[in-house]
Amino acid sequence: MEEEDMFDLLKKFTGIVGVSGNEEEIREAIIEEIKECVDEIKVDTLGNLIAVKKGKGKKIMVAAHMDEIGVMVTYIDDKGFLRFSAVGGVSRYDCIGQRVKFKNGVVGAVYYEEKLEDMKNLQLSKMYIDIGARSREEALKMVNIGDVACFVGDAVLQGDTVISKALDNRSGCAVVVKAIKELKKTDNEIYFVFTVQEEVGLRGAKTAAFSIKPDIAIAVDVTMTGDTPESHPMEVKCGGGPAIKVKDRSVICHPEVRKLLEESAKRNNIPYQLEILEAGGSDPGSIHLTAGGIPSGAISIPVRYVHSPVETASMSDINNAVKLLVEAIC
């Protein structure tokens, strides 16, 4: 039942188009889930959703970014084909032959303008989106310059495995939503922040942390794994438990926050792994440099094929991340 409930939430969240800078729909979906479980809800100027459980103890910030990678229309030619640029870390190798979906429901196919002899020469600038329009005028009735689209990848549950687009980071959002619902009592004052624009530079977390000025911050996000044939050697694997971040390219996690997370896991027999991510950053990267310095750390959900339409994770890792977060902040 626990896995079914979590999968339903994941399916709901991952099915929403929420490319960086366009997080309105996922934000409203999260509000609908948590509005009866917190003392205060507000949306700041940048678009971060901040939900507060009031208390007199430590001020704790829990962050999970709402946005996903995607593409933005930059040009429409006379035949109705769309040129685009990446929003966030879009892999050119994962684009060709994929479907993309716009916020208004329009779906297009991504393809290449010429025969490709060598994949090393693959360029986003030579790709286009076909939405079935026969002219520029017809295309403009369907989409416009500046419109964004996400990749299509419906959530599928297979045993303990979930496969979907946007597990980065709708899985983190789902973990925080479940933690809000399960956290019955705490003396701490907890600011649950669903941040915007993480994929384009950790932007929302920075402004939210500056306004909240928490005593500590814990982010919930995904991390890469080292358990597939092509992967770089890495200790983290799917099914091994949530990962406690040691460092990535944007942050060396504060030792006291890491200690809090490790001790919470050990005390409650929650399996965990230690994460050292050599590429990529996360919200603690901007949080820890804000307001004079904020002790920051992260719980990471191991995900294979990050930034692809087939991101793959373990449901047990996701559910154990909920347990770890609740124990760490209560």
Swiss-Prot record:
Its cofactor is a divalent metal cation. GO terms for molecular function: aminopeptidase activity; metal ion binding; metallopeptidase activity. Keywords: Aminopeptidase, Hydrolase, Metal-binding, Metalloprotease, Protease. A divalent metal cation 1 binds at H65, D168, D221. It is an enzyme of class 3 (hydrolase). One of its GO terms (biological process) is proteolysis. It holds the Pfam family Peptidase_M42. The keyword Protease applies. The keyword Metal-binding applies. Its EC number is 3.4.11.-. It comes from the Bacteria. InterPro entries: Peptidase_M42, Peptidase_M42_aminopept, Peptidase_M42_dom2. PANTHER family: AMINOPEPTIDASE, ENDOGLUCANASE. Belongs to the peptidase M42 family. This is Putative aminopeptidase. It comes from Acetivibrio thermocellus. The gene is celM.
